[in-house]
Amino acid sequence: SSAAAQTTMDDDAAPEGDFNSSSSEAAPSDGAYLGIEDVRVGSHDGYDRIVFELTGEGTPGYFVRYEDVPTQQGSGKPISVDGTAKLVIDLRGMGYPFDFQMEDFPSDSVKPTSTSVIKEVVGAGTFEGQTQYVVGLKGDKTPFKVFSLNNPNRLVIDFQSK
């Protein structure tokens, strides 16, 4: 695992680095204790983007990978999400919603209409310091990249679109 790339830019800025279909992993910063304020999905020229806006202290870690049948942490129950390929995102270094005066982190299904490859994003809860989301994609396993942004603190996943 490597340190997460840290960049300051707005949600629309084009990212650096290469797209890849293999799993991507990074450890959270020491003492990271984060909550999720917002989940946004957008379409850009050449890529679709998911932004997790965070609150709390530190930089998030993550484990992002494709799974044929995504299952919930802890329970092992299958997670239902629209799409052919399914990408599982575990955000690491997370607290629980009540620690941030929230009833829950954003978990409602997001079904964007303007995206090329993202069909649905579903929140699957927090368990032992990890908050899980599953992304359903149109078509095959789409190359992606994961990185962190500052001011505000965000974790970003970009999906290459045709």
Where are these regions (language model features)?
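Short linear recognition/processing motifs and adjacent strand/loop elements at protein termini
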Residues: 2-162
